[in-house]
């Protein structure tokens, strides 16, 4: 299960970032959204964009988000 802050690998073959690793920026909770997961990358694509929306089945979690320290 991907969550905000997770490091994910992209499985969509037609994507510029195919097989690259990005960080989940947010996940939309609506049930009718086709690509609810916004992923941010370190490098930009041809248009100068560094984010893209993906479906959960197009992502594999590589690293879980870091736990926040308790106060």
Curated annotation (Swiss-Prot):
It is found in: Cellular thylakoid membrane. HAMAP family: PSI_PsaE (MF_00613). Stabilizes the interaction between PsaC and the PSI core, assists the docking of the ferredoxin to PSI and interacts with ferredoxin-NADP oxidoreductase. This is Photosystem I reaction center subunit IV. It holds the Pfam family PSI_PsaE. GO terms for biological process: photosynthesis. It comes from Mastigocladus laminosus. InterPro entries: Elect_transpt_acc-like_dom_sf, PSI_PsaE. It is a peripheral membrane protein. One of its GO terms (cellular component) is photosystem I reaction center.
């Amino acid at each position: 299960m991907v969550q905000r802050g997770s490091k994910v690998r992209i499985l969509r073959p037609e994507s510029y970032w195919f097989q690259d690793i990005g960080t989940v920026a947010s996940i939309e909770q609506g049930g009718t959204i086709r690509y609810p997961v916004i992923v941010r990358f370190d490098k930009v694509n041809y248009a100068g964009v560094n984010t893209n929306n993906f479906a959960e089945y197009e992502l594999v979690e590589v690293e879980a988000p870091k736990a926040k320290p308790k106060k």
